Amino acid sequence: MWAPPAAIMGDGPAKKVGNQAPLQTQALQTASLRDGPAKRAVWVRRRSSEPQEPTESKAAKERPKQEVTKAVVVDLGTGYCKCGFAGLPRPTHKISTMVGKPYMETAKTGDNRKETFVGQELNNTNVHLKLVNPLRHGIIVDWDTVQDIWEYLFRQEMKIAPEEHAVLVSDPPLSPHTNREKYAEMLFEAFNTPAMHIAYQSRLSMYSYGRTSGLVVEVGHGVSYVVPIYEGYPLPSITGRLDYAGSDLTAYLLGLLNSAGNEFTQDQMGIVEDIKKKCCFVALDPTEEKRVPLSEHTIRYVLPDGKEIQLCQERFLCSEMFFKPSLIKSMQLGLHTQTVSCLNKCDIALKRDLMGNILLCGGSTMLSGFPNRLQKELSSMCPNDTPQVNVLPERDSAVWTGGSILASLQGFQPLWVHRFEYEEHGPFFLYRRCF
């Protein structure tokens, strides 16, 4: 039976924690993060198939052998699913959330009854597939496919038995409460995990910075959020959600490239995604950037078929959609405007605290120049304040890293929801531990 480890002293200098802070934050505040994620394993007790050494006591002989297995942290995003063991500084496995489904004609032939192709399976099949994503703007719309993705991650990528590991899952801000109940149902009933916990993505991103308060600005693949957090508590009433993100930038870049004389199709979105990552950047001042001679912006990109194309001003024009969403026909606020809007909804004391703790997260923020541009826009909009944008080198994995830190702290161990508790009390027991 799975059980958390006994308390171990020496996690670092304890800090005073107010009673108002949630247990997740208390666990973080009582641990030193200077040396990276605390490397604490969770225990799983199971009977070993190996022969037991004879012992003097019958009780000792019948006691199951203990093996140390670390908790697994899973961050499911619209673009990628990242997973790995708690205590590590970065995820060890990362696959696309996009999966392949056989077309109906193929499925009816009976030649291949496999219904979902995940990860490397997409490259190792002759079946004609259509690509589908089980998430839409960060929210799960196809739980069966998510289960297929996790089955592949656990069995094929990590090569573990999920019934032997506790699992911590990330959940996006403002997601339906039913999300958590569905996660619990899947983990406990389909994977038989001994324990699980669900934590908000924005809170985990903040933990990766070693903070317990901050304004998390997260720009992922399918959705963007601006989330104020005070002493571990997200403030949903003033949280900002923007339904544009990295995938919209890729689609906009495709249009710009075609306007320049190229002929990319929707089926080549993966190539455009690669162009975005390797060639594009965010201009500090787009007006000044346009005055730069075209030859200084022009670079060559080699397509998979060997053909070369040239990119010029598209390299920085595509990212302007984050600051001027009308370019992609969106009526929502720009990222910088939404950030200031959230700050202005806070009271004076909280606003002052959050101004200096603007935490940038998400894969789309990895574009060169993104932090400096956001810093410039915020400083321009808040001349009487001193906004400070903070960045981590690997902020594209901030959610996962925060989960790795949290799940490996000794103070967090009482917050696991055990399978026997779920079976006894039902899904509503989740809300006593996951908040």
UniProtKB/Swiss-Prot annotation:
Residues spanning the signal sequence: none
Compartments in which it is found: Cytoplasm, Cytoskeleton; Golgi apparatus; Cytoplasm; Nucleus
Swiss-Prot/TrEMBL keywords: Cytoplasm, Cytoskeleton, Differentiation, Fertilization, Golgi apparatus, Nucleus, Spermatogenesis
Annotated region described as Disordered, given as residue ranges: 1-20, 29-65
Positions of region (Required for interaction with TES): 31-51
InterPro entries: Actin, ACTL7A_N, ATPase_NBD
SUPFAM superfamilies recorded: Actin-like ATPase domain (SSF53067)
GO biological process: acrosome assembly; fertilization; single fertilization; spermatid development
Feature: compositional bias, Basic and acidic residues: 47-65
Cellular component per GO, a single term: cytoplasm
Quaternary structure, from the entry: Interacts (via N-terminus) with TES (via LIM domain 2). Heterodimer with TES; the heterodimer interacts with ENAH to form a heterotrimer. Interacts with ACTL9. Interacts with CYLC1; the interaction may be relevant for proper acrosome attachment to the nuclear envelope.
Purpose of the protein: Essential for normal spermatogenesis and male fertility. Required for normal sperm head morphology, acroplaxome formation, acrosome attachment, and acrosome granule stability. May anchor and stabilize acrosomal adherence to the acroplaxome at least in part by facilitating the presence of F-actin in the subacrosomal space. May play an important role in formation and fusion of Golgi-derived vesicles during acrosome biogenesis.
Family affiliation: Belongs to the actin family.
The name this protein goes by in its record: Actin-like protein 7A
Annotated organism of origin: Macaca fascicularis
